[in-house]
Amino acid sequence: METPAMFIKRCSRSIFLQVVIGLVIGVICGVGIPDLAVQMKPLGDGFIKLIKMLIALIVFCVVVNGISGAGDLKKVGRIGLKSVIYFEILTTIALVLGLVVAYSLGLGSGANIHLNELPAGDVALYTGRTQEIHGPVAFLMGLIPTSVFSAFAENDILQVLLFSVLFGSALNLVGEQASGVARLINEFSHIVFRIMGMIVRLAPLGVFGAVAFTTARYGVDSLSHLGALVLVFYATCLVFVMAVLGSVLRLSGVRMLPFLRYFREELLIVMGTASSDAVLPQVMRKLEHMGIRSSTVGLVIPTGYSFNLDGFSIYLTLAVVFIAHVTGTPLAMTDLITILLVSLVTSKGAHGIPGSALVILAATLTAVPAIPVAGLVLVLSVDWFMGIGRALTNLIGNCVATVTIARWENDIDMPRAQAILDGRLEAPAKADGEPLKRSAVAGEGKLHG
């Protein structure tokens, strides 16, 4: 039987257990001492800001190191094209699933809420910002930074990714003459990852602060309001993860449950902070540790964070149909097709917009004349809870995408991946912060560090 001393020792070595404890204490504090708990919000916000502080540098280091040592630049382009095609297919499936579930269940039907009963003030906060969502040409132009420094200063990951791909490609083409620069960036990445390891140690504190504030602010029973929407959303996300993503992962030779268990610490942090940004560096590191080439991880994950938003896609069509039903708006087949087509465009505009979920939802409602935009206020009270599901599903979707594309490209050491997922090889050290390296030939060599 485990003694208290043994349990404390085990907790001191496990970030996973520390995060669980932080989450539980956060709930207790939120229920028992709400006045104090609401003041804990800066702990969660501060943790996320510390993580975001390094994301651009980590993306730069991982992508440059991966591409400069990849050898074949045509392969890099091929991975990028396959990623975009994969993202479009999976997000379309997610959009259709949300639409079909909400419509077939009649989600929100019978509420008969009148538009004059809805407060317009909160809606204006989001509808007034829909101009931030640009068309395709403006979006593509927005990928080009004003300067290299502005991309890093504004933490615009897509702009950083573009520069990183160009920089890594140039290093690759220059070859031996630039070997000193390549070594310098590789050594710099060790420093960045060491800092990240120090920050990750603060995850339990960040989760505690975020959960304590949320419990005190919204209450344990706050899900009862608009509970059907929240429950159906989570059920739909679960079906998507286990059935759709599970099937995709199975085709790659990996089972979903061991895969989720491997990322359990990251999923817990996302659950506590409602932000998948908080775990991006750790996720990239673990995917490399599984045996996936660093250049593939460095291309797929940052791009997926903007284009492969499966959880957000489910939320978008589900919420639009819900708002139509609760406001008594009849939906014809042409309306459903319009919702789907509009969502295919607006769902790609979420990158870099604060409060993006509600802003994109407002933009979608604005583009579908049949549905009143004022209905947006109906989902405001539960948006934070749905945000947890969005972030979890988005994260899992991007991890699955990386494995799938790596499998297509033969960029994953499958025996190593299976050994790690089965527990025959250890996961990377919990917070040592060291970047992982892999040989340039897919399927050969081992991970080090």
UniProtKB/Swiss-Prot annotation:
One of its GO terms (molecular function) is succinate transmembrane transporter activity. It holds the Pfam family SDF. GO terms for biological process: L-aspartate transmembrane transport. Disulfide bonds: none annotated. PROSITE patterns: NA_DICARBOXYL_SYMP_2. It is a multi-pass membrane protein. It comes from the Bacteria. The chain crosses the membrane at residues 16-38, 53-71, 84-106, 157-176, 197-219, 229-251, 311-333, 358-380. Keywords: Cell inner membrane, Cell membrane, Membrane, Symport, Transmembrane, Transmembrane helix, Transport. InterPro entries: C4_dicarb_transport, Na-dicarboxylate_symporter, Na-dicarboxylate_symporter_CS, Na:dicarbo_symporter_sf. It is found in: Cell inner membrane. PANTHER family: AEROBIC C4-DICARBOXYLATE TRANSPORT PROTEIN, PROTON/GLUTAMATE-ASPARTATE SYMPORTER. NCBIfam families: PRK01663.1, PRK13027.1. Belongs to the dicarboxylate/amino acid:cation symporter (DAACS) (TC 2.A.23) family. Responsible for the transport of dicarboxylates such as succinate, fumarate, and malate from the periplasm across the membrane. HAMAP family: C4_dicarb_transport. This is C4-dicarboxylate transport protein 1.
